[in-house]
A protein has these predicted regions:
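Fe(II)/2-oxoglutarate
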Residues: 1-11, 332, 344-345, 349-376
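Non-heme Fe(II) oxygenase catalytic core, chiefly the N-lobe of the double-stranded beta-helix
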Residues: 4, 9-12, 24-238, 245-252, ...
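Hydrophobic beta-strand signal
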Residues: 16, 261-262, 284
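Short, charged beta-turn/beta-strand-edge "cap" motif at the junction between a beta-strand
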Residues: 262-268
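A short hydrophobic beta-strand segment most commonly corresponding to one strand
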Residues: 277-292
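Double-stranded beta-helix
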Residues: 288-317
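Long, charged, low-complexity terminal extensions
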Residues: 311-346, 352, 375-376
């Protein structure tokens, strides 16, 4: 791929990757998911009166998509767009880890599943947590042009959920993303993004320190759109200069098997109304680097997987979840590399001579934590 294309992805903070899975394979995954839901009436979903997002994490469809070789390659590619300004940073982009999330089947006409412009990864934490704040230090120093959104150095150990928020994420996700299982275009219940990553982030970080009307310095305790225990929200009143009415851009038309990814700081929203004729269905699959905190997260998530229980970031964590469900995934049939990315299986990760000091260190730690019998 040309460097100019890679630079554009880094600049915009988002990408559509075509044909990650064959079209028919993606459609088969949707059909399988629908069958799994129908076979298990106890599945929880919201909104409860017209389900759109299903509280499923270990269905055969989700597990197969996460473990697919093309999906692992896609995550590795997305991770490779990142770097650390410190070679000692304990992060591996060679071996991304798998974060289990939910699935969405949004029906035509739906207007209930509407998420306004927001950014995940906490809100006040960006200023409050000392390590997280260092991510944006160049912006706070008045040198926003020098800020590098793809530098993971201070994100690795940042605390992005200081308030145990119900929608918080305990893992460091380089990119959020989903795999399309539908033919869906703009206005058809899909995603909108603000493709001005560096500019929008600089505005967000500096916004609490000036009056939006006069532009004068404002050092009171207000942080517009930031509420403890919630993600960062945006609207024309709190962040008027973002001009959200025009700066939020719909994701291009996608087909089953296409993958959409957006940077962890990207402002995103969902169409208020699904104006299409077919369902807008996706499997949420982010790209996560191997870092010490993420390894510890995977260790806990692995326990949830084997118990068919919701992972620690989601409602009902530790509860019965999908225990006893008809058609539950058989872990013995999941490919080895896919299992390993979930901290399962029996083989650890290999080191290579060209890896940085930090990458070697985190791989050794991951093997000790997740595969102690192999690393011993």
């Amino acid at each position: 791929m040309k460097d100019s294309v890679l630079d554009e992805v880094r600049h915009r903070g988002s990408a559509v990757i075509r044909d990650v899975l064959p079209r028919q394979s993606a459609l088969d995954l949707k059909k399988q998911a629908q069958g799994y839901i129908a076979a298990n009436p106890g599945v929880k979903a919201f909104p409860p009166d017209d389900p759109t997002v299903y509280e499923l994490y270990w269905s055969p469809s989700q597990t197969a998509a996460r473990a697919h070789p093309n999906m692992l390659l896609t995550q590795r590619f997305l991770a490779s767009l990142w770097h650390s300004s410190d070679s000692r940073s304990e992060m591996s982009t060679t071996y991304p880890l798998t974060y289990a999330d939910r699935l969405r089947i949004r029906r035509p006409g739906d207007g209930k599943f509407a998420l306004g412009p927001h950014t995940d990864g906490g809100s006040l934490e960006r200023w409050e947590d000392p390590e997280y704040a260092k991510v944006y230090q160049r912006i706070l120093d008045g040198e926003w042009e020098e800020y590098d959104p793809m530098d993971a150095r201070h994100r690795i150990n940042a605390r992005m959920d200081l308030y145990d928020s119900p929608g918080g994420c305990s893992a460091f996700r380089l990119f959020q993303g989903w795999l399309s299982m539908s033919s869906t275009g703009p206005g058809e219940g899909t995603l909108q993004l603000c493709p001005l990553l560096k500019h929008a982030t600089a505005y967000l970080i500096l916004r609490p320190f000036f009056d939006s009307t006069s532009g004068s310095l404002n050092l009171d305790s207000s942080f517009p759109g930031s509420v403890p225990g919630a993600g960062q929200e945006y609207n024309p009143e709190t962040h008027p200069h973002l001009e959200l009415e025009s700066s939020m851009v719909s994701v291009p038309h996608v087909e089953p098997g296409d993958f959409v990814a957006w940077h962890c700081d990207t402002i995103h929203s969902v169409d208020k109304q699904h104006m299409g004729r077919g369902d807008a269905s996706v499997l949420y699959i982010p790209a996560c680097a191997m870092t010490p905190p993420n390894v510890e997260f995977i260790k806990q998530q692995r326990m949830a997987a084997l118990a068919y229980s919701p992972p620690q970031d989601f409602p009902g964590a530790g509860g019965p979840g999908e225990v006893g469900f008809h058609g539950a995934v058989d872990w013995g049939k999941v490919p080895g590399d896919g299992l390993r990315a979930m901290g399962l299986g029996s083989s650890g990760w290999e080191k290579s001579p060209n890896m940085s000091e930090g990458e070697v260190s985190v791989i050794e730690k991951a093997n000790r934590v997740l595969f102690p019998s192999v690393s011993a």
